[in-house]
Design a protein with these regions (language model features):
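Conserved nucleotide-binding/hydrolysis micro-motifs of P-loop NTPases
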Residues: 14, 30, 78-79, 102-105, ...
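Conserved nucleotide-binding/hydrolysis modules and their immediate coupling elements
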Residues: 231-233, 239-335, 345, 368
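Long hydrophobic segments that form regular secondary structure
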Residues: 266-273, 277, 352, 360-363, ...
Length: 594
């Protein structure tokens, strides 16, 4: 049986979880059709998800259709949980992008579509809620072609949901990537050729089939299920080779911790030793997507227990693989968290294990912690989970924008034995690096000049100290070079280097100087042409730098670089300035000096 790892993605309230529930029910995987409103869906397993009616964490469920075993990955729709979506996208064979026939193409829909396209994920579009009052048909198809991709092919009728034969309109789309279809215009259209090309081009993410239906009533779902079978590529479980997989989630079940991974090649079973970037370990449990102990083959989803060092993003079978670059913007807010209750650090560390971008770190007051956030909904969810799962009543400060520090120039400092209380010599040079290069560390001093434990103590301390620069923000994009070392055996201990290194680094940073940089967003705004002047005024008022607007008939588009801290203000003002017809898509655009 071939395997398909299928993601379901959408903007919030498009009906994504309802579609997941319908696919599971119609395939016989569940006996009862749950509902989001009823709080009894299979993939929204957390009490908090059921109460709020939103998906917070990606969840995996399994069903069988024809000769396919489908691992269905339901992802969050709210933009505050976009990190969950990003982790899931990297392990998919195909995706269903859900749109609401009532709300239409939303800004987050466009962000998701753009990301799926950049990853080359074969994608089916499902227009949900076709039975609702206010549902749009032809006009929505026009919006899909204009805002998402012109390379779409409707596969059933939006009016009666009957199958649509592949005719001239489909051939015109398929001919863009097929000389055979182009030739068929002369020789006469061959439906079998068109179907073969639809399958091929869907699998290569060149075209995007569109299905209409209703997850609640089940209308159009049979056609969608057949499209999943016919059009989306599958993984071959017989794929041989060395173990290769990616950890995309951390779960806790029955008091045990599991790393959830998708395998791309090889096999994995209990007691196998697994190598990854930060070490290796032996799996004491290997469960399949249905929580049964099994041997997992290529294409499968494995829940791996017993290896505490496994983290999200780790590549199984490789000790050298580097993480994939982020495709969604990082969190640009942070808040200080305090609590009178014990267990704050343990609770937040647990949540950060599931979502590393929370990035828990020490706060300004004793016992306080700082967390990174995407928005208010995520803050509310973290507070609720701390209270319900760990008995911790946490208070959050007002979120502030996360800035960073970049070096102005090169700085160098040396402190030798005898000059301080520490029996050690350390010299460090710090210099600006390339944008997005992170913190790099290298040796100029001879590697054998210090025992390995002392070398490790220096590097670890450098990286930890750069988390808080001279102006209170993280220092980024720099190269740190260890230039001088010295010790006195047997008096010197690792603590001498851990205590001396921050002093040397502080002096080097003071000589280099730093500049505070704020996060920026590239905002693309679509609006009626008559709203251009007021929107431009808004962008300038919020510190943005707009480009020349592009006007096409009665609509217009403008791109601007704006501070992340003002983005929410722009989003809130836009509907009033455009009579509800303005849409904004933002992507992280790096950092800019204040």
């Amino acid at each position: 049986m071939r395997m398909l790892n299928l993601g379901v993605v959408a903007h919030v309230d498009a009906g994504k979880t309802s579609l997941t529930e319908r696919l599971l029910f119609d395939s016989g995987a569940i006996a009862h059709l749950g509902s989001v409103d009823g709080g009894d869906t299979r993939t929204d397993a957390m009490d908090l998800e059921r109460r709020r009616g939103i998906t917070i964490r990606s969840a995996v469920a399994t069903f069988t259709v024809a000769d396919r075993k489908v691992h269905l990955i339901d992802t969050p729709g709210h933009t505050d949980f976009v990190a969950e979506v990003e982790r899931a996208l990297g392990v998919l064979d195909g995706a269903i992008l859900v749109l609401s026939a009532v709300e239409g193409v939303q800004p987050h829909t466009r962000v998701l579509m753009r990301t799926l396209q950049s990853l080359g994920v074969p994608t089916i579009l499902f227009v949900n809620k076709i039975d609702r009052r206010g549902a749009r048909h032809t006009g929505l198809l026009h919006d899909i072609r204009r805002m998402l991709s012109p390379m779409v092919i409707p596969c059933n009728s939006p009016d009666d949901l009957a199958p649509m034969p592949l005719g001239v309109p489909a051939a015109e789309v398929l001919a863009e990537h097929s000389d055979a279809v182009l030739q068929s215009y002369v020789d006469g259209l061959d439906p079998r050729l068109l179907h073969r090309e639809l399958v091929r081009q869907t699998g290569e993410a060149l075209v995007y089939p569109v299905f209409f239906g209703s997850a609640i009533t089940g209308a159009g779902i049979d056609a969608l299920r057949q499209g999943i079978v016919d059009l989306l590529p599958t993984a071959d479980p017989a794929s041989s080779g060395e173990l290769d997989g990616t950890v995309f989630a951390i779960e806790y079940s029955g008091g045990r911790r599991f790393a959830v991974a998708r395998l791309f090649s090889g096999t994995l079973k209990v007691r196998d030793r697994i190598t990854f970037a930060s070490g290796s370990g032996r799996a004491t449990a290997v469960l399949d997507a249905d929580y049964r102990e099994a041997t997992i083959r290529a294409g499968g989803i494995a829940r791996i227990g017993g290896i505490s060092g496994l983290r999200i993003g780790d590549r199984l079978g490789s000790a050298t693989a580097t993480p994939e670059p982020a495709r969604f913007r990082p969190p640009t807010l942070e808040a200080v968290v305090t609590s009178p209750d014990e267990g704050l650090y343990a609770g937040l560390s647990h949540l950060a294990d599931e979502d590393p971008l929370i990035n828990v770190r020490p706060g300004p007051q004793p016992g306080s912690l700082i967390v990174s956030l995407y928005g208010e909904v995520q803050r509310e969810v973290i507070a609720a989970r701390l209270a319900e799962e760990f008995g911790v009543k946490a208070e959050f400060s007002a979120p502030q924008v996360v800035c960073v520090e970049r070096l102005k120039r090169t700085g160098h400092a040396v402190k030798r034995m005898g000059e301080t209380l520490f029996v050690a010599t350390v010299g460090l040079r710090i210099e600006p690096g390339e944008v997005d290069s992170g913190v790099r560390y290298q040796l100029e001093a001879e590697r054998g000049s210090l025992p390995a434990a002392f070398m490790t103590a220096i590097e670890d301390t450098v990286r930890a100290a750069l988390a808080t620069g001279p102006q209170g923000w993280r220092v980024v994009d720099c190269l740190v070079t260890l230039t001088h070392t010295g010790y006195s055996s047997p008096v010197t201990v690792a603590a001498d280097f851990r205590n001396l290194t921050p002093l040397v680094l502080k002096e080097a940073l003071e000589k280099a100087g730093t500049v505070v940089c704020q996060p920026m967003e590239q905002a693309d705004i679509d609006m009626p042409a008559d709203a251009v002047s007021t929107v431009l005024n808004l962008l300038v008022r919020c510190g943005g730098a707009p480009e020349m607007p592009v006007v096409r008939g009665d609509s217009a588009t403008v791109r601007a670089i704006v501070p992340s801290g003002r983005l929410r203000e722009i989003e809130q003002a836009l509907p009033g300035l455009t009579n509800g017809h303005g849409t904004l898509i933002a992507r992280f655009a790096g950092y800019q000096a204040l």
